[in-house]
Amino acid sequence: MQMTLVPYVVEDTGRGERAMDIYSRLLKDRIVMIGQEITEPLANTVIAQLLFLMSEDPKKDIKVFINSPGGYITAGLAIYDTIRFLGCDVNTYCIGQAASMGALLLSAGTKGKRYALPHSRMMIHQPSGGIIGTSADIQLQAAEILTLKKHLANILSECTGQPVEKIIEDSERDFFMGAEDAISYGLIDKVVSSAKDTKDKDTIS
């Protein structure tokens, strides 16, 4: 199994130096990173971070940076519902890619505060899954996939302003977009090349 090295940073707190992992340091600036496949463990971590930041300051913006190929629908929807549950604005940023559930989470940010860097790529498609078991099991799982397909299309329609029928049609196959195309589609609001281009003036303190 490939191990990912998590960098540590050292800060001078006035009472000596303190080391912390990079994600904890970013959390101090209300920055949450989704930088891998969206799994249940990742979703639980992201949700805990979001709820912690809400408890610290229920009015101050939270920044969510996304570089993800997508992942499990239930995990992604758990993060989506949490974003909508928060009382504060959530600024979403696509860096690299936001595919599948990653694209849905990108679009779920506060309208006017959904961003992508210039060379980012976004992709939407219909849900898929390996179906095994008895014929009755296969029927049930196929019906669930169709239900999720309509459910996700409704969410994307609400977030982007596109008709549900267009979302369903475009999602039949992998539907890729560049940053400018994503603006036209309604996934994001602005392409930014610098933190100064956003409405959030304190992206990193």
Swiss-Prot record:
EC code:
3.4.21.92
Q: Top enzyme class of this protein?
A: hydrolase
Query: What is one process in the GO biological process aspect for this record?
Result: protein quality control for misfolded or incompletely synthesized proteins
Q: What is its main location?
A: cytoplasm
Q: Which domain of life is it from?
A: Bacteria
Which Pfam families does the record match to this protein?
Answer: CLP_protease (PF00574)
Q: Which reactions fall under this protein's catalytic activity? A: Hydrolysis of proteins to small peptides in the presence of ATP and magnesium. alpha-casein is the usual test substrate. In the absence of ATP, only oligopeptides shorter than five residues are hydrolyzed (such as succinyl-Leu-Tyr-|-NHMec, and Leu-Tyr-Leu-|-Tyr-Trp, in which cleavage of the -Tyr-|-Leu- and -Tyr-|-Trp bonds also occurs)
Q: Name one GO molecular function term.
A: serine-type endopeptidase activity
What family does the Swiss-Prot or TrEMBL record give for this protein?
Belongs to the peptidase S14 family.
Role description? Cleaves peptides in various proteins in a process that requires ATP hydrolysis. Has a chymotrypsin-like activity. Plays a major role in the degradation of misfolded proteins.
Q: How does it assemble?
A: Fourteen ClpP subunits assemble into 2 heptameric rings which stack back to back to give a disk-like structure with a central cavity, resembling the structure of eukaryotic proteasomes.
Q: What is the protein's name according to its record?
A: ATP-dependent Clp protease proteolytic subunit 2
Q: Which organism is it from?
A: Chlamydia abortus (strain DSM 27085 / S26/3) (Chlamydophila abortus)
Q: What is the lineage of its organism?
A: Bacteria, Pseudomonadati, Chlamydiota, Chlamydiia, Chlamydiales
